[in-house]
Amino acid sequence: MSANDIKFFTPQIQLLDEVYKNASVTANLDGNSALVSMTANGNEFQIPVMDMDGLGEYNRKTGYPEGGVSLTFETKKPNIDRARVFIVEKMDNQESAGLAFGALSGEFLRTKAVPELDATRLATYCTKGKGKLTKTLDPNDGAVWVKALSNATVDMDNAEVPQNDRHLFITSDGLTAVNNMQTIESRAILARFADVTIVPQPRFVSAVKLLSGRDTEDKGGFAKADGATDLQFQIISGSAIMQWTKDIVNKIINPVENQDGDWWKFFFHLYGICEVYDNKVSGIYSCMKEATA
């Protein structure tokens, strides 16, 4: 791989970030990248962790009570670590190869990588979050959806989950049922959330199985895990989770150097972390369908 290869394809690689943001339904939960760094080996995240004690009595003689408020960094290994190799046949010039790579990688992100990433994140938050309701909601009855959403917000209010940082993820039929009511109650409940995002059902399940991309699972991707059920809505407080992702095309082999054949090879690596802070599990509320026999 030459430095010129990487330099030439850099514009296409940088555009992948925009493709991700536009295609992902969970990109709005991404943490502040300025607060996260990678370790020297580039394989682990350094995540900011806040620890704080409550106020104590100030004493005129002894001064401030012991304890305090601190920001430290905890090293975390990624729980998302996936990869693929893109192959582009040799073309007349490098410009054509760049356009082909841009189209290929963009389509791959939109149709393969992002749906898997969304599904993995939402399933992880469902598993680790505290709030759960297992009840199949009638898609033709908006009132039952409003009631379930109202009960969820009350639970989160009582758990002191920040009210201005709650993001609602909901199925299309669920949101349609609520909107079709056109009542004060239906409008009021949706106004409780920082934003409302429709999630396609294949990405919205309680657990996923990630396929290896090898042997009998050579197609890769993800599937609904055995025993998993469909999610109907999920409320997530941004402050309750740690979510960061890196996608890197960190290696390119041109047709001249490629010993496998007369084509370009682009090595794509997607890794990241999606976790729930141990002391903020009440910041996740998931409503899922009842299991069917």
Predicted regions span which residues?
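Hydrophobic alpha-helical segments and helix pairs
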Residues: 97-148
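Extended, solvent-exposed, turn-rich assembly/linker loops in the middle of proteins
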Residues: 130-197
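Long, hydrophobic/aromatic-enriched structural stretches that serve as scaffold segments
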Residues: 66-116
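Sequence/fold signature of self-assembling virion shell proteins
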Residues: 2-31, 36-50, 54-56, 71-79, ...
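Charged, low-complexity surface segments at secondary-structure and domain boundaries
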Residues: 1-4, 89-93, 131-139
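Short, glycine/acidic-enriched capping/hinge loops at junctions between secondary-structure elements
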Residues: 57-63
